[in-house]
UniProtKB/Swiss-Prot annotation:
Coiled coil regions, renumbered to chain: none
The entry's keywords: Secreted, Signal
Top-level taxon: Eukaryota
GO cellular component: extracellular region
Cell compartments where the protein resides: Secreted
Name of this protein: Protein FAM24A
Annotated signal peptide: 1-29
UniProt family annotation: Belongs to the FAM24 family.
Organism: Rattus norvegicus (Rat)
C-alpha cells in the first residue's frame, strides 16, 4: 500500500507525536502535584497562630562586641599611615600623574 519511505516518515511522525503527548502529560502531572502542595501549605499557614509562626522562624543574632580601634599614626611622608605599606611616589602629590 505505502512504499518504504512513506512508512518510515509515518513511523517517525507517530513517535514524535507520542513523545510530545507523554511530555505534556508529565508536565501537567507535575503542575498538579505542585499546586496541590502549595494549596495544602497555604491552608496550614492560615490555621496557625501568626505570632507563634513568626517567633519560631526568627533566628536571634549574637551581639558582637567591638574591640576599640587603635589610633593610626600619620607619617610626614605623603601623610600616609604607619601601619599601611608605602605607596608609590606618584600617589603622594594630588596633581602628579594627571
Amino acid at each position: 500500500m505505502f512504499d518504504l519511505r512513506t512508512k518510515v516518515m509515518i513511523g517517525i511522525a507517530s513517535t514524535l507525536l507520542i513523545a510530545a503527548i507523554v511530555l505534556i502529560t508529565v508536565v501537567f502531572c507535575l503542575y498538579l502535584k505542585i499546586s496541590k502542595a502549595l494549596k495544602c501549605a497555604r491552608e496550614v499557614e492560615s490555621c496557625m497562630d501568626p505570632t507563634k509562626a513568626v517567633s519560631e522562624k526568627m533566628i536571634r543574632g549574637k551581639p558582637i562586641i567591638a574591640d576599640p580601634c587603635r589610633p593610626l599614626q600619620c607619617c610626614d611622608n605623603c601623610s600616609l599611615f604607619k601601619d599601611v605599606g608605602a605607596m608609590p611616589p606618584c600617589f603622594c602629590g594630588t596633581n602628579e600623574g594627571l
